[in-house]
Every structure is written in structure tokens, then in C-alpha cells.
């Protein structure tokens, strides 16, 4: 079209100006690249239209630019490192003989493929990066359990060293190097990679008679909400009982800060980090030493993408708030941490470059001994068989209670107890559950996509219409 001079340059210019205004208003961090591309493209179009002598020259230049861009863009692609392949092989060897149906968290390499189960069908993960994952589960993780938000958007759910979350979500196994988390013991090691196990965690499915009313639960704040979740089933019809917490609050003094990086400046509640990974080292208050430490505060300001994201890491547990112009702004204004290291005496706090307005700083602690017996007050469910979208289980519970799963609730689930369909409901703010009378029961949990049949019918109709339309076009020819 350009070579034949059939392009309307005035119309193209008008539309381009409108597009430029939209880009300018949008204030994307990539706007400058668009402006450069726009200017170069218009120069090339002008010479191709009005300077015939330069047609071949600019065609060559255009091809060179495209080739150069392609090479630079593809240069960013990286092959899988041999060390990653070695890690994966070590992990496969470590987990191949595990015969329990439990969850596993890979803490060795956060970039590991979260959907890879390494050949062991008994192991599951509750970490995913997907726009199609359960919105109910996503909301539970970040808004109910107040788990650390480690990434630039909420769609990424990656492993954490949060002992409360690990125990609640049935993470019996961890894989990594030098893991020092309460409750986990090394049971095998290959090379530099170790397999750790914690038998104190809640099972994949269980029955509990300890219930807590959802309205009362919604009034709780971090970290008390996590403690109640570990010890109760949250339901609409739960008990209105008073919960006796084991969590205690402690206070941080300025004298507890033992080291301040030269790139950090502190003024009242504002911390200025002049350089990436600037750090503080803070002594843990004496009452909280060796305990599970909870930290929470509000980050009341934001900053431009010209500076970058805001992030604070405490002993490797990171919370991130995206810069203001980022298209997937995560809105993380409340930073919470669960520091689960054994022998905890001090914490290292690291900052990305930026200005941090920190308000309402609170510290709490709890002993691991106060939560390690959570699975003593429930009845574990036997998972007899998994066949496609069907889970067959059995349980003998000594009193009436709730059958609790760690499966995100969905309308597609059907539950049969001793062959009879029962009503399901949302428990623990996200999971599939239902009431279960005391006694010995055989239970089948089935899943069928709610709109699967409609989707199949519409697909068939679409194929028929496509064939019919092409047949008519063929006849006309």
C-alpha cells in the first residue's frame, strides 16, 4: 500500500495523533519506546511515499531495524541452566518414593515450574500462576489469611516460609537447602537438596467438631485470624464461642536496631533506602526469641515506576507493592509477615530503593508448642482412591462435625455420603465442606464443570454452522 501510494497520509496522521494522546494519558512505563517507534515509522513512511530515490535505501534500513530488534529481543531468552536440570533431577529422586497424598512446597528455587509434580501423583501444590485459578482461593490467601504478597500481581501464588500457612494448607513436605522452619525435620538428602517433613500439619481432608462463627471471625485481625483458622472450622453456623488466644504482643524499641546500612536514613516513621537491598539488623525482643514472630504494618505511600517497586524482606520473607503506573498494580498497602525460623534471635530487614512511610507497626509471637497439636483434635479422612474427577474416601468420626477439604469451593462438586447426596457449603472462607454425622461413612466427591455440557453443545453447533457456511460458499463458486 505504501509503495503504490494508496495510503491516505492525512488520515493516518489524524489517527496517529489520537493514539498518541491515548498513550500520553495512559502514562505507561513503556511510552517512550512507543514515541520512538512512532517517529521512526513516520520518517520511513514519508521517504517511501515522497522520496522515490530513497525507496530501496529505506527498505534496507527498515529490514535492518526489524532484524536488529528481533535479535535484541530474542537475546533476552535464556536456556535452562544445567544447575536447574540438576536440581530437578535431585528433587525427582527425593520425592519418587513418597506414598502419602499430601502437599509439597519447593523452597529451593522460586522460579521452578509450579505445575511440575516431578512424576509423583501423590504430591500436590497450592501454588500457581494462572488467570483461571479460583478467585475464592486467591482472595483467601491474600485477604483472609493475610499471606505475604511476593510478586507484582495477585495471580502468582508461590511458596512461602510461613509456618501457619504451611500447616493449614497440608504442606507436609518441603524441598530446599538448609531449611530451618519450626516443625520440619530433614528426612533425606541428595547433593545439596534436602527433603523435609512435618507430621503436625492438618490433613488434606479431615472431620472437626470445633466450629467458629464466620461473623465473629470477620472481626478478627492478623495474626489472630490465622490462629483461629488453624484450630477451628469457619462456618455460617459455627459456635459464637470466645477463643482464648496463645498469641502475645511485644514492642520494638529503637535500641533493638543493631545495624543500619549507610544507604538507609530513618526519620520518625519514614525510612529512606538510597540503594537496592539496603538493610537493617534488628534484635528480636527477648520474650519472642526462638518463637514464631508475626510482623504487621501499613505502607501508606506509593512511588513512581521511574524509581521502581517497593519491597521489604524480613529474613527472606518478602512483601512487594508495585509502583503506581504498573498495569497490574497489586494494591498491597498492608504488609504482614510470619517469621518461622528456629532459634530466632535477630531479623535482617532489606529494602528496595525508595521512600517507605511505615505506620501502625505491630509485633506478636507464639510458641510452636502452642500449635503443634492441631491435628490431635480432628479425625483424619482416609483417601481410598482417586479416579479421574472422583475422590473416594472413608472416615469413622466419633461425633458430629464438619467434613473439611482443602479444595477451593466450586458449584461443580457433588458429594455422596453412603450413596446419598448431601448439601455442600463454603467452609474456612474458601474450601469445600459439608456437615457429617458421627459414625462410619464412605464418601465420594465428584467434580463436573458446571457449564461443560453447554460448552460441548455450543461447540458442536459452531462446527455445524462453520461447515454449512463453507459449503454454501463452495456452491456459489
Locations of the language-model features?
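C-terminal, active-site-flanking charged/polar segments
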Residues: 1, 43-46, 64-67, 185-217, ...
Amino acid at each position: 500500500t505504501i509503495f503504490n501510494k494508496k495510503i491516505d497520509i492525512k488520515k493516518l496522521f489524524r489517527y496517529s495523533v489520537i493514539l498518541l494522546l491515548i498513550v500520553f494519558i495512559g502514562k505507561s512505563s513503556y511510552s517512550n519506546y512507543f514515541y520512538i517507534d512512532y517517529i521512526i515509522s513516520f520518517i520511513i513512511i514519508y521517504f517511501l511515499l515522497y522520496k522515490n530515490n530513497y525507496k530501496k535505501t529505506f527498505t534496507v534500513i527498515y529490514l535492518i531495524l526489524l532484524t536488529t530488534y528481533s535479535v535484541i529481543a530474542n537475546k533476552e531468552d535464556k536456556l535452562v541452566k544445567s544447575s536447574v536440570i540438576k536440581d530437578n533431577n535431585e528433587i525427582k529422586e527425593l520425592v519418587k518414593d513418597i506414598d502419602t497424598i499430601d502437599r509439597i512446597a519447593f523452597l529451593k528455587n522460586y522460579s521452578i515450574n509450579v505445575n511440575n509434580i516431578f512424576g509423583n501423583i501423590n504430591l500436590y501444590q497450592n501454588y500457581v500462576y494462572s488467570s483461571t485459578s479460583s478467585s475464592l482461593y486467591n482472595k483467601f490467601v491474600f485477604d483472609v489469611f493475610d499471606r505475604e504478597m511476593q510478586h507484582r500481581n495477585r495471580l502468582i501464588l508461590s511458596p512461602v516460609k510461613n509456618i501457619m500457612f504451611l500447616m493449614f494448607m497440608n504442606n507436609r513436605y518441603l524441598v530446599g537447602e538448609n531449611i530451618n522452619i519450626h516443625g520440619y525435620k530433614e528426612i533425606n538428602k541428595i547433593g545439596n537438596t534436602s527433603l523435609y517433613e512435618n507430621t503436625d500439619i492438618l490433613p488434606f481432608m479431615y472431620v472437626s467438631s470445633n466450629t467458629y462463627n464466620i461473623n465473629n471471625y470477620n472481626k478478627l485481625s492478623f495474626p489472630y485470624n490465622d490462629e483461629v483458622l488453624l484450630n477451628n472450622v469457619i462456618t455460617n453456623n459455627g459456635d459464637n464461642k470466645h477463643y482464648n488466644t496463645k498469641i502475645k504482643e511485644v514492642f520494638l524499641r529503637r535500641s533493638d536496631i543493631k545495624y543500619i546500612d549507610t544507604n538507609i536514613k530513618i526519620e520518625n516513621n519514614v525510612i529512606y533506602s538510597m540503594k537496592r537491598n539496603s538493610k537493617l539488623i534488628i534484635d528480636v525482643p527477648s520474650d519472642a526469641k526462638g518463637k514464631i514472630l508475626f510482623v504487621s504494618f501499613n505502607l501508606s505511600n506509593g512511588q513512581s515506576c521511574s524509581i521502581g517497586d517497593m519491597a521489604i524482606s524480613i529474613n527472606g520473607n518478602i512483601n512487594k507493592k508495585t509502583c503506581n503506573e504498573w498495569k497490574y498494580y497489586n494494591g498491597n498497602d498492608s504488609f504482614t509477615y510470619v517469621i518461622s525460623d528456629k532459634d530466632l534471635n535477630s531479623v535482617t530487614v532489606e529494602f528496595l530503593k525508595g521512600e517507605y512511610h511505615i505506620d501502625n507497626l505491630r509485633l506478636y509471637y507464639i510458641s510452636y508448642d502452642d500449635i503443634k497439636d492441631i491435628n490431635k483434635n480432628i479425625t483424619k479422612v482416609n483417601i481410598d482412591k482417586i479416579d479421574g474427577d472422583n475422590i473416594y474416601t472413608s472416615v469413622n468420626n466419633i461425633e458430629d462435625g464438619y467434613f473439611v477439604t482443602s479444595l477451593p469451593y466450586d458449584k461443580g462438586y457433588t458429594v455422596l455420603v453412603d450413596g446419598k447426596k448431601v448439601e455442600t457449603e463454603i467452609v474456612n472462607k474458601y474450601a469445600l465442606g459439608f456437615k457429617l454425622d458421627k459414625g462410619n461413612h464412605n464418601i465420594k466427591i465428584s467434580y463436573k464443570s458446571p457449564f461443560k455440557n453447554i460448552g460441548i453443545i455450543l461447540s458442536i453447533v459452531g462446527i455445524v454452522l462453520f461447515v454449512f457456511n463453507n459449503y454454501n460458499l463452495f456452491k456459489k463458486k
